[in-house]
Amino acid sequence: MNDKLILVINPGSTSTKIALFNGLEKLKDVDITHQAPELAGFASNLEQLDYRYAAVENALKDWDCSPADLKAVIGRGGPLKPLSGGVYHVGESLLKDLQSGKLVDHASILGGLIACRVAADARIPAYIADPVSVDEFDDIARISGWPELPRLSLSHTLNIKAVVAEVAAENGKRPEDVNYIVAHLGGGFSVAAHRKGRQIDVNNANDAGPFSPERSGTLPLTGLLKMACSGKYQFNELKKMLIGKGGLVAHLGTSDCREVVKRIEAGDEKAKLVLEAMAYQIAKEIGAMATVLKGQVDAIILTGGVANNPKVVPWIKERVEFIAPVIVKPGQNELKALAAHACRALADASIVKEY
């Protein structure tokens, strides 16, 4: 009997993953890919709310499920104010911040908004968990070269923490016992140093680090300043170059790494150079995080959708295997991790945090 139905919603930069769980048992799931031309018509992720909500509605209809059948809805957490990890109720103050348009423009802001919309009519709880703004930085990691622009902790925290726990458990350890470098490779890339249960450093995938399928990553600053001051571009146009139209999209016109591999196999040398350059930058960021951990690295974990790629993974491994063993956990643990958070919240309301 499906008496603990939980709907899980995970909006990413280029996809929306939706799943129906009965407790921790996944009953149904769908991974909807949003191609770059579809998303190009939206000036921000917030503008995609109706578009992404429709995808969730359609999934529920396909599964012959209504919100009234659910016990709870949980969405991926967005770039809110710095928070501790855990599960949060989607209440008025959290909604206000998500709807403000003042947050970092990331698809994860839609997780709580969609969850709340689904839950509202059915009068069931809506949650988020381990939002991208979980902040466990050492103070030294916050310092940039300009006092008014500190480095921020914004990352794919949910999947990183889930895969750290999984790999540690497979080795008879707890997250508090190990030092891992985790490269989350999705539409955006987060490369994190995880020391004894804390994520002490990570690149902000919107601002810096390797370029990715649709983000520009670290760019030459003087060139970027010249573009910004040229008068040719509005702010939103420049932002879209950095987040949404950058990376593989800018170079090759697609955010789909599988398509790029097909081009390479057909003899496209430009596609090979660009994809290998992306792997090169990922490896370089992993090397940087090894210095954060002072070389005391138990394992390097590659996770996310791009960790399935038959070209990218070997290119990374050949550059970083000298640091530590490389463990590949393709795909994401985020759906199950969110479902587990919701189960714990339903079982013990005292663990649910208010924003």
Predicted regions and their residues:
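Short glycine-rich, Thr/Ser-proximal phosphate-binding strand/loop in the N-terminal lobe
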Residues: 6-47, 207
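Glycine-rich phosphate-binding loops at beta-strand->alpha-helix junctions
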Residues: 297-316
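Short beta-strand-loop/turn "lid" adjacent to the catalytic site in phosphate-handling enzymes
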Residues: 60-107, 125, 133-144
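Glycine-rich phosphate-binding loop plus the immediately following alpha-helix
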Residues: 110-117, 128, 143, 148-179, ...
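Adenine-nucleotide phosphate-binding core of ATP-dependent small-molecule kinases
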Residues: 240-295
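N-terminal phosphate-binding loop and adjacent alpha-helix
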Residues: 29-68, 94, 98-103
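Phosphate/pyrophosphate-binding loops at sites that engage ATP/ADP/AMP, CoA/4′-phosphopantetheine
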Residues: 58-71, 169-173, 286-298
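Conserved phosphate-binding/catalytic loops in two-lobed NTP-binding clefts
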Residues: 310, 314-340
